[in-house]
């Protein structure tokens, strides 16, 4: 896969990890951004033409000051689809990216093919409150997000040696920039009343969850299914919240079966 750049009419300029051929699939990342190693996207690009844009405020993407609320994020998603020259692509999103993809599908229900949501944010159950990721340290994030925290720590830091002060500084600055952007739609809780809009969703929908997810527990999968009649739910063993990175082959098999 290779990096390209997409510029939207609103003025955002976003890096896009692109590769593969065939049916277009646009993948929206979560609050942590795209990690250095992306076996899920690499594998998906063996079957589809994959576009994985970075949100403004992530990596070298610019224009974060232009996005202020959930509607801005959803419209930005469609602006990116237009900038990429795509017509009715499949949309997929992980965590925060799943929340945005679902909002996009409610906003323009006939403008996408199918919808894939991997451990999406966006709903709230009082009996299962979602932990505040903005109050956690990096090592705490790994314990919360990954089935294997040690491996997760290496993935989150890109293998950087955080005992090196410069590496630690660079990691924290990047993390703060990413979380400042994510906080616009996730803080103080990741609930922007999406449940009231899901009735508009017309696309066939697949919901995928990690059985060991400790951030957004699998009980949320049942709530999504209740709000999206006909939605298919798959729960993957050996994965927590970061299932695209923990079980890439398994999630690709499930997606390929669903997308065709």
Tell what function each PLM region has.
Residues 41-43, 200, 205-239, 245:
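Conserved loop-alpha-helix segment in the C-terminal half of the alpha/beta-hydrolase fold
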Residues 51-92, 253:
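Active-site loop/oxyanion-hole signature of alpha/beta-hydrolase fold enzymes
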Residues 117, 127-128, 143-203:
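Conserved alpha/beta-hydrolase catalytic His-Asp/Glu region
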Residues 245-257:
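Post-His helix in hydrolase/transferase enzymes
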């Amino acid at each position: 896969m290779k990096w390209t750049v997409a510029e939207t009419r609103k003025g955002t300029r976003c890096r896009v990890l692109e590769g593969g051929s065939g049916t277009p699939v646009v993948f929206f990342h979560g609050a942590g951004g795209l990690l250095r190693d992306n076996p899920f996207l690499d594998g998906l690009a063996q079957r589809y033409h994959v576009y994985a844009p970075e949100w403004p405020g992530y990596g070298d993407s610019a224009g974060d000051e232009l996005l202020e609320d959930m509607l801005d994020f959803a419209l930005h998603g469609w602006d990116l689809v237009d900038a990429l020259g795509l017509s009715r692509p499949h949309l997929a999103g992980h965590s925060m990216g799943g929340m945005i993809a679902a909002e996009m599908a409610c906003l323009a229900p006939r403008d996408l093919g199918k919808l894939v949501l991997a451990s999406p944010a966006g709903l709230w159950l009082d009996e299962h409150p979602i932990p505040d990721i903005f109050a956690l340290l990096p090592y705490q994030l790994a314990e919360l997000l990954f089935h294997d925290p040690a491996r997760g720590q290496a993935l989150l830091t890109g293998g950087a040696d955080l005992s090196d002060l410069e590496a630690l500084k660079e990691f924290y600055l990047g993390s703060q920039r990413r979380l400042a952007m994510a906080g616009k739609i996730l803080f103080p809780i990741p609930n922007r009343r999406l449940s009231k809009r899901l009735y508009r969703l017309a696309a066939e929908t697949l919901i995928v969850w990690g059985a060991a997810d400790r951030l957004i527990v699998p009980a949320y999968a049942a709530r999504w299914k209740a709000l999206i009649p006909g939605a298919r739910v798959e729960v993957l063993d050996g994965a927590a919240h970061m299932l695209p990175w923990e079980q890439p082959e398994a999630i690709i098999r499930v997606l390929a079966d669903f997308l065709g």
